[in-house]
């Protein structure tokens, strides 16, 4: 009974010592007398004179330890004494385990950040030309092999064909894109061709005025004072007489005429003029030339 009372009083002393409410002390010291008569094992374990058990333990660590193990001090005093003897090792192991867990979490977070950073750096861009197009000037990008890739600021028209594609082996295939000079040339050619087509259409639409004359004559070509050159002939339906086409022989004169016979009355000659003459008739020129030739005979006559 004396040993049990001594153990209970010892438990009371230790409980007063490790009271977590007392915050005036920076640390807690636990000492056990060497003449304890609880048991032979306890006397052998406490044979050394009063030794320090837990020097300068933190207040938060001790509170957490007492909060996690409250029932051991109430129900089993002997177990609480053994627990008090092993208190430094338990606290140190708990602190080391919490520190290792924090370090492990830190390493995991660091590895996660490194992994996400490497994945984001290795992930290919869906549209590598978008930044250069918005910035308005050319830039250069490096691929995984270290070679530079020049980016043109007019690649917005590449669409599906432009850009860099990665295959399964990680090699880059560069698609040929038209340069700015080629695009400018094609655009200029397109503009020129469209202008030419417009001019041709306007020429086709504009027609010279036509004048038609009907005369009774046995000769197809009538003498109208101008010189003509025949350039075509066409067979007309329902008549045996073909249609003839003539052009004025004067330089820069675009007047044409068409001569044909009337289908109902072949004696009638229909002459159609297209355009107007900008010069005097050729007969007057011939008359002038003849008059000058009579007044001034050619030089060849003097050599005979």
From Swiss-Prot:
Q: Where in the cell is it found?
A: Nucleus
Coiled-coil intervals:
none
Recorded hits in SMART domains, A to Z, give: WRKY (SM00774)
Q: Which GO terms describe its cellular component?
A: nucleus
- One GO biological process from the UniProt record? regulation of lignin biosynthetic process
Q: Single GO molecular-function term?
A: DNA-binding transcription factor activity
Annotated Acidic residues bias: 149-159
Task: State the signal peptide span.
Answer: none
This protein's superkingdom?
Answer: Eukaryota
UniProt keyword Repressor, yes or no: no
SUPFAM superfamilies, alphabetically? WRKY DNA-binding domain (SSF118290)
* Annotated stretches, region: Disordered: 141-190
* Family note: Belongs to the WRKY group II-c family.
What is the protein name stated in its UniProt record?
Answer: Probable WRKY transcription factor 13
Q: Which organism is it from?
A: Arabidopsis thaliana
């Amino acid at each position: 009974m004396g040993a049990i009372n001594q153990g209970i009083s010892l438990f009371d002393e230790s409980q007063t010592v490790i009271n977590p409410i007392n915050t005036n002390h920076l640390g807690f010291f636990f000492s056990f007398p060497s003449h304890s008569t609880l048991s032979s094992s306890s006397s052998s374990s406490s044979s050394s004179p009063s030794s320090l058990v837990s020097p300068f333990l933190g207040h938060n660590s001790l509170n957490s330890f007492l909060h996690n193990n409250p029932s051991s001090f109430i129900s089993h005093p002997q177990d609480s004494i053994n627990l008090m003897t092993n208190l430094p090792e338990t606290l140190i192991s708990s602190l080391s385990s919490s520190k290792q867990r924090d370090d492990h979490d830190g390493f995991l977070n660091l590895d996660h950040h490194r992994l996400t950073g490497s994945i984001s750096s290795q992930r290919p861009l869906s549209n590598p030309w978008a930044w250069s197009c918005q910035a308005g000037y050319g830039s250069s990008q490096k691929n995984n092999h270290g070679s530079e890739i020049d980016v043109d600021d007019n690649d917005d028209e590449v669409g599906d064909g432009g850009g860099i594609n990665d295959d399964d082996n990680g090699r880059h295939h560069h698609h040929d894109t038209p340069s700015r000079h080629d695009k400018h040339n094609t655009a200029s050619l397109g503009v020129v061709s469209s202008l030419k087509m417009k001019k041709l259409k306007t020429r086709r639409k504009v027609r010279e005025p036509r004048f038609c004359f009907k005369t009774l004559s046995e000769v197809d070509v009538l003498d109208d004072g101008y010189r003509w050159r025949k350039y075509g002939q066409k067979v007309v339906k329902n008549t045996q007489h073909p249609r003839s086409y003539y052009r004025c022989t004067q330089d820069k004169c675009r007047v044409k005429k068409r001569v044909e016979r009337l289908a109902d009355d072949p004696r009638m000659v229909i002459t159609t003029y297209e355009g107007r003459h900008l010069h005097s008739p050729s007969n007057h020129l011939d008359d002038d030339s003849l008059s000058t030739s009579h007044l001034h005979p050619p030089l060849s006559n003097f050599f005979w």
